[in-house]
Amino acid sequence: MADDDDYQDMDNDDFVDDNEMEDVIEEEQQRPDHEEEDDDNNVDENFELFDQGKAVPTSEHVTTPFMTKYERARVLGTRALQIAMGAPVMVELEGETDPLEIARKELKQRRVPIIIRRYLPDGSYEDWPTEQLQLADW
């Protein structure tokens, strides 16, 4: 074939010299240690630590007690994955074998052992157990 002939006639100029790669590896190893860690707080300078928000007490929830369609999708997907990986099922099975159907049944009966964390604009967050959230579109 013509492709095979082109391969054998290929100039060696198309390939990178192996010695150039070794130079790059050696340069990375010669970096001083003080560049990788900051002596003040022992944190890599490429990371920025954010202050953790504070939890809003359960009695002072600001957001609505309705589960959004996005939260519902995330809860169902997460719970279905857990069930598929062998997590114990929280409802009586009536012949269901599909993990997603089992997760839907658990959600309808409010037996999903998942807590939804809603972040607020001020950096704080609210934790809502799925049992406390109302499902709108069943």
Swiss-Prot record:
Q: What is this protein called?
A: Probable DNA-directed RNA polymerases I, II, and III subunit RPABC2
Lineage, top ranks:
Eukaryota, Metazoa, Ecdysozoa, Nematoda, Chromadorea
Q: Which family does it belong to?
A: Belongs to the archaeal Rpo6/eukaryotic RPB6 RNA polymerase subunit family.
Family matches, as InterPro entries: DNA-dir_RNA_polK_14-18kDa_CS, EF_Hand_1_Ca_BS, Pol_omega/Rpo6/RPB6, RPB6, RPB6/omega-like_sf, Rpo6/Rpb6
> Can you supply one Gene Ontology CC term for this chain's record?
RNA polymerase I complex
* UniProt-annotated stretches for the region Disordered: 1-46
Here the segments flagged for biased composition (Acidic residues) are: 1-27, 35-46
User: Which molecular function term from Gene Ontology is one that the record holds?
Assistant: DNA binding
